[in-house]
């Protein structure tokens, strides 16, 4: 039936609130991009890694910077990020100790990225599948986060983007940027009609 005046008022308020939120997100997005200009290369490198998007890459950069040379090695970098398990061997058996103390924010960000990475067609997903049965989800995620931080180390030291043969980079780029492209086209007066993929 027809909406009452009160219902129309509430819906109008909701629409206005959503419009304000969208405008705020646009401003934050622009601010983020401006802030990342001096670190554009490192920011872009991070986003080539499965599970790491624009926001996560920016937050990671805030914590680690774009020069990792002072860490000296991937192992020290991982240890600093609390992602280097204290492992030792005894009588030919590998025993795992507790993860060392370190930068809890980087550890958190990379564990979140690991949760995203295992959902991509990548080596991270395959490694996770091999670990989760034996170690459980939480320990497997920490192991993936450890692999991610070592990947970051090698990308930054070699100045090369990440490449995984299991990923369709062209399709991933379209999926990632399509909403922004569509919005930009609509802003400039173009009519965008989405068709189902075949």
Protein language model features and the residues they cover:
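A detector of single, family-specific signature residues
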Residues: 1-198
């Amino acid at each position: 039936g027809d909406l009452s005046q009160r219902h129309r008022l509430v819906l109008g308020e909701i629409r206005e609130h959503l419009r304000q939120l969208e405008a705020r997100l646009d401003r934050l997005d622009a601010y983020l991009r401006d802030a990342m200009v001096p670190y554009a290369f490192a920011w872009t490198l991070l986003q080539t890694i499965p599970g790491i998007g624009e926001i996560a890459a920016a937050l990671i950069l805030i914590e680690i910077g774009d020069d990792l040379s002072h860490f000296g090695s991937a192992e020290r970098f991982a240890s600093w990020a609390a992602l280097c398990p204290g492992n030792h061997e005894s009588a030919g058996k590998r025993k795992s100790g507790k993860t060392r103390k370190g930068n809890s924010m980087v550890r958190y960000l990379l564990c979140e990225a690991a949760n995203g990475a295992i959902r991509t067609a990548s080596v991270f997903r395959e490694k996770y599948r091999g670990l989760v049965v034996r170690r459980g989800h939480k320990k497997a995620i920490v192991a993936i986060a450890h692999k991610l931080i070592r990947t970051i180390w090698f990308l930054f030291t070699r100045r090369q983007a990440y490449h995984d043969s299991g990923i369709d980079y062209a399709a991933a780029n379209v999926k990632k940027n399509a909403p922004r492209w569509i919005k930009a086209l609509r802003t400039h007066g173009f009519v965008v009609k989405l068709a189902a993929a075949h």
